[in-house]
UniProtKB/Swiss-Prot annotation:
Origin: domain of life: Viruses
Species annotation: Human cytomegalovirus (strain Merlin)
Family that this chain belongs to: Belongs to the HHV-5 UL128 protein family.
Protein name: Envelope protein UL128
Alphabetically ordered keywords of this record: Host-virus interaction, Membrane, Viral attachment to host cell, Viral attachment to host entry receptor, Viral envelope protein, Virion, Virus entry into host cell
Length: 171
């Protein structure tokens, strides 16, 4: 049978199906009130709803942003990146395995990649505290410290105690 001959048959079969039993994926419902005036403050969680509406959970309650503000959704969510916990980020997309998430322009999220812009990453550290270690400096510091200790012991004429503490077998 050609695809043209199957079309009426498949259409009739589709109409005969009981659509009440077909599982449907429903978008999460958002809160009823839409915020239009002030930016969110101290919000700690967000969810994407139907028609690109974003709902933020804040201490004052849930604040929603309407579909007309889709250009701002990315900016709205990124304002709260410092207050998102690692667990909240993980619960958004568990397949990312605690790695940062990337926020698309329309509010969708995906697992972050190495070359993504850092300003749109959720769950990434803004800066990693570090300390440069100069190995030569560490050796010199250790030698200087030992020499200072030896000099202080020599003043007190307790060189034998110093040798024992430092583990040297001086003869």
């Amino acid at each position: 049978m050609s695809p043209k001959n199957l079309t009426p048959f498949l259409t009739a079969l589709w109409l005969l199906l009981d659509h009440s039993r077909v599982p449907r994926v429903r978008a999460e419902e958002c809160c009823e009130f839409i915020n239009v005036n002030h930016p969110p403050e101290r919000c700690y969680d967000f969810k994407m709803c139907n028609r690109f509406t974003v709902a933020l959970r804040c201490p004052d309650g849930e604040v929603c942003y309407s579909p007309e503000k889709t250009a701002e959704i990315r900016g709205i969510v990124t304002t709260m990146t410092h207050s998102l916990t690692r667990q909240v980020v993980h619960n958004k997309l568990t397949s990312c395995n605690y790695n940062p998430l990337y926020l698309e322009a329309d509010g969708r999220i995906r697992c972050g990649k190495v070359n993504d812009k850092a300003q749109y990453l959720l769950g990434a550290a803004g800066s990693v505290p570090y300390r440069w270690i100069n190995l030569e400096y560490d050796k010199i510091t250790r030698i200087v410290g030992l020499n200072q200790y030896l000099e202080s012991v020599k003043k007190h004429k307790r060189l034998d105690v110093c040798r024992a503490k430092m583990g040297y077998m001086l003869q």
